[in-house]
């Protein structure tokens, strides 16, 4: 039987194993910092995804055999072949699919006509219905929840799971990712902030006077396509389950929760159920985030998720994301998916759609940059200049209603010509440093809000003003705006004539024996 890595988490793991991209660690590993340190080393060196089969257990863990193992780096980069293999597998694509094609696949499949609703299946088709813990049996503090970073304010149980919430009128069921930290034996606290959909859905309950008891489910080890789409900036009100069905051309099987009316993926490792209490606020964080820092004194006041039921499968596996220095899931998923949605939105723009070929958030910039590749021959036809182009791009991506939420994480948009491969950071940074005049070729947008998690925003004056810090940088030579035949020779291998390059490539083994 063929494997389905997009819709079955264990199949995803098996494909990684089959392709030599999984390492099973049977040596005992302490979830207190050791798991985090190992995963960080794996991310930063593009090593195989680690599956921790033998976590150091609290003697009071009610079911140490099945609660639980940990999979690290599920969306990290691969160190051989196609580096984006794990992201491709999340979508059921061939593991050799490069990031540009992944982005194009997401753009091509954004059509709402292709949405396929989930299908409700019996509980016996759901492995996580095997074991159950009641409210009285639950003690989250006894589970092997990892302390991922040295500066974290607590143990973050939720870094790669999926929250499920539904509006009171049941018109919108939202699947999303937002971090969650163990607060006490039976509750989790996590970020419930704008522009996240979990905030918008829970706001509807608050407006109805029921903000203290909002039903939720927290699912771990969900279909990889589900966790990817849960990271996507899809339109408000859109249902992720239908979106996933459209992407995979197959309905997502779902089952009913045990203590509320929510439906969750049938293919889960663990499901926590309970209710979100927006009226009770507690200390949350800090947590090492996507930009590579943890500030120990930076904590927040956030609401509680009260857990009253846990269901789980045999030898359950909890996938985790350990954010930090590139490249991890906060870059490959969040940054990559912002690239896809931005490319789609640009394709709908009457002017930019004619000149923009590709967009990408380079990981080396921690998803704070967006590189935009411009067709310079089409650019000439616009009869514009650098300042006007920068204003057009920035006004649309930073200010417009369509793009504001999608591009909220971005602080600098970099425009380059079509000779640059924006997926190659070496080329991008070369163009950035040599083709723009600092300040002169940068247009600032001081009226837009900064991304609060960006370290220069959270640790500087922007945290008070909450305005500015964003710009568009034009790395296109002035003559390229007016002369379609403007020529320059790049002093690298690709700059040589084709016949010379072909001859060199054919005879390379003779030169370097």
From Swiss-Prot:
Entry keywords, A to Z: Cytoplasm, Decarboxylase, Flavoprotein, FMN, Lyase, Manganese, Metal-binding
InterPro entries assigned to the protein according to its UniProt record, in alphabetical order: FDC-like, UbiD, UbiD-like_C, UbiD-like_N, UbiD_Rift_dom
Superkingdom of the organism of origin: Eukaryota
Leading EC class: lyase
Enzymatic reactions: (E)-4-coumarate + H(+) = 4-vinylphenol + CO2; (E)-cinnamate + H(+) = styrene + CO2; (E)-ferulate + H(+) = 2-methoxy-4-vinylphenol + CO2
Chain positions recorded as prenylated FMN binding sites: 174-179, 196-197, 240, 405
Transmembrane domains' residue ranges: none
This protein's GO CC annotations: cytoplasm
Needed cofactors: Mn(2+); prenylated FMN
Positions of Mn(2+) binding: 174, 197, 240
Record-annotated active site: 289 (proton donor)
Cofactor note text: Binds 1 prenylated FMN per subunit.
EC code: 4.1.1.102
GO molecular function list: carboxy-lyase activity; metal ion binding
Function: Catalyzes the reversible decarboxylation of aromatic carboxylic acids like ferulic acid, p-coumaric acid or cinnamic acid, producing the corresponding vinyl derivatives 4-vinylphenol, 4-vinylguaiacol, and styrene, respectively, which play the role of aroma metabolites.
UniProt similarity note: Belongs to the UbiD family. UbiD-like/FDC subfamily.
UniProt protein name: Ferulic acid decarboxylase 1
